[in-house]
Amino acid sequence: MVVPGTLVTEPGNTPLGPSEPSSAQEKAQPPKAYDMLRMDGERIITEEEHFGIINGLLTAGINYRDVGTLSGLYAPPYASSDFNLELRLFGEKVTTKKYDWRPIEVRREGELHGIAVSTSTLLTLGMRGGILAVTLRNATDKKQDVPVQLGISGTFDNVKYWGFPRPDTTKNKTIIVVGQGRIIHYNSAGAFVVSSDFNNLVWEEASEWSSHWVTTVVMRPGERRTHYIAFTLGPREEAESLCDRLLKDPSDVIQRSIEASTRKNEDLSAKLPVFEASDSRLSAYYTRSLQHLMLNKWTVPEFVLNPYYSTGSIKGGCVGCYLWDYASVPELMPLYDPTAAREHIKQFLRVDITKHFLFNPIDGQGDGPTYLVNQEKIIGCIYYYVLHTGDVKFLEESVNGKSVLEWVIHQATHGDDLSRPAVLVDYGENVSHLELRHQYKYNHILPDVNGGRYASYVRAARLAALAGKEPTHLVARPEPLKELLKKTLWDPQGKWLGFQSDKGELELRYSNIIFTLFGTGVLDQEMELGLLSHVNEKEFLSDYGLHSISKLDPAYDQVDIDHGGGGSYVAFPGMIAECLYKAGYPDHAENILKRTLWWAERLPYWGDSIVANQIDYRKDTPLQCAMDAAAGAQCVIFGICGIRAETSGEITVNPHPPKFSPNISLKGVNIRGAHFDVIANRNDYEVRVGSKTLRSKVGTPVVIAASA
């Protein structure tokens, strides 16, 4: 039997040689579902600076190049940004030969001077703490005295604001208290505590920056033993008490955490459909994309919402909740966590989204300037929540003196005057929309934002009708906007929608954000075909993805990955592919999507932006685990599998199996009270609803009757 810190190739063996029983951890046998999201380190391109694990209360950085270093602990509201725990044998770090990743655990293996070392760093579920299990095996035929050092350092703070950057606690020094097998770093904000069961630990303090425990482990030939190091943070008494609990029976704690993590994986699969494809890359892409809902879910008592879904998570990056990002998966959230979807919508309505783009989870206050898409985003969240749950009464709930429906109408008409003829809104010099670098602009009368107003009016009118209100004033607005958009901003020669600058001139900026207008109804056929003519390898496509700006645009900047050229904001390939599926262009959709399947093979989680012409990702950002990376899975359900909830309560199914993966299935769909499976190939498909099976040819939709 093997310990959690061992990578197993065959029962009872490790890649470094035969294993021996470890009585301290015999219970800790990981269930199969625990490995659902596992990834081998040899495939991972994520750099150490961005590499970590999370348990919903705590996220920790793992230095995978050696077997025993941790860097940075973030357990909102507490943090130690420069926390460092470093294991050395014979005075040096043990180089990692093999490692793997799971959401709450990293396992590493190495060998030094005949001592095989395997470690497991695991965050304990439901706690602001974790365990580093260290297994040593003397692989020689001689007795060995193994010098062990544990370096421990760091500052600490109770952080009141969690926005875009990682918190920086380095100005908040700590007082160090050393006890038997325990070290406490504390100040007025709280503490982090490290405890270990290594025998005869002696604290050697060289300076405030260089201190470590030392001991010597005497090992007989072939002997194998496991020791544990627990780490916790929070209020001092709580952190000390938790450390004691973790070391009292570490194997039991590890087993319970593995089981709890397994249940979280199973919960993800139970609440959202299970997708399988003949091309296993597509199946893996779907599952890896879905996990971002789980990885960005916090259960922090101090947060204004619990559970709370952050924009980012790993290593404390971008823990604030941005409306842009949260609302990029509006169709998924009501299926996965409908109660949280309601609460997040209401929290955004409490914040003035005409002035702010995020709210701080500690106090719920808005921060930052506005984003121009905020109105379209919040309406989309409300629209899909009502459609996918059937909870029409939500529109009657009051938030800050207005009903949810009144907020929908308020946001849809923002910047407009319904008593006057329709106009395209001039958004001024706002540069936050695409955040382009250098001298290149994209401002004033913008095609994508004005085009998005069309969809907002359509959705607002439908919601009003569902609530029994007369939506005449809303219904009358979309068509004039559509006409104005084409008349004012369409360039038939460039086959593109331009923006009108402050000089009144039409300028072209070939941004992929325009493609998000597909499927909304605001584009006519001439515009759709014109825009699609640019989806080629000279302009927007490369071998490994979609570019945010055409490679022929003078504003193209290789290093500006998210919106400036070199790649794309992580949600956009999935979002755009879904829009194209909905608009009736499946070939173009799959041509984009298939280029991004490598993400699931090389990145354990997906950050802000991914490069399109290399296997690489954006590194100059703390947002390395983005919630809206789940847009890929959203595309699979609502694009490839063609699931659509109608305002009538009916569910339409119209799948589009891709050429590169002709056989697909989506099982366990649960939307608006309807439960069904979809099994399809390139010719025909069937929808199984209870004991009934509905069959059809691909291209001919099946309609499931509204639930009672």
Cite the ranges covered by each PLM segment.
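Terminal accessory carbohydrate-recognition/targeting modules of carbohydrate-active enzymes
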Residues: V2-R281, K582-Y585, I643-A708
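C-terminal capping/lid segments that line or modulate ligand- or cofactor-binding pockets
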Residues: G5-L7, P15-S80, Y285, C318-C321, ...
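Alpha-helical packing segments of well-folded alpha/beta enzyme cores
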Residues: G130-L132, H227-I229, K264, Y285, ...
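Secondary-structure boundary elements
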Residues: R137-Q144, P338, L418-R420, R462-H473, ...
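Structural helix-adjacent loops and short alpha-helical linkers that scaffold large soluble proteins
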Residues: V274-S283, M333-K346, V386-I409, A461-E479, ...
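Extended glycan-interaction surfaces of carbohydrate-active proteins
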Residues: E276-V319, E343-Q365, H410-I445, E483-S568, ...
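Aromatic-rich carbohydrate-recognition surfaces in CAZymes
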Residues: G317-Y427, P447-N450, Y454, V570-I576, ...
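Extended amphipathic alpha-helical segments enriched in small hydrophobics
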Residues: L446-P471, V475-P478, K482-L485, G567-L603
